[in-house]
Amino acid sequence: KEGSLTKIQGKGTFISRNKTVYPFDHGQGFTYSCQLRGVVPSTRVLNLDYVIPTEEDRLFFQLKEKEKVLMIQRLRLGDDKPCILETLFFPMTFSSLCEESLDVSLYSLLKEKYHIQPVKGHKWIEICKVTPFEAQMMQAQPGDAMLLMHEMVTDQFKKPLHTSKMIFSP
């Protein structure tokens, strides 16, 4: 994409810090993508917690200060290899997700059990350097560069559904 790289004479070409924003395309998630490619998807739930959201997420969910959100952190694997480290944030109206089996497609679960479908939103992509924890999960080295995607997704009723942060293996 134009403007994604910066060339500095005598130093090299670098990835710019500009974020590219893309429209959300109806939520065909990881499980579906794997199935299309003949890859066996699996998921390990790493963490469930109630956390104070970032200011950006708080505004998206229209929360008051100090209101918490549900955080779900999962490692998505394809043929048993780490593909995505995802951290999702849901408003407390979805706190019952804690009682569900979260090693399945969340979009399928939301559709089948809660009659909720991801419809619109936006995402932006940037490059990040992984932390020691992220590196361990992704079988990489701390500081390695990986693709980081953020999403803000609304449902069919135009209500905020979730935000997410996903780190993709190269």
Task: State where each predicted segment sits.
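N-terminal helix-turn-helix
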Residues: K1-I15
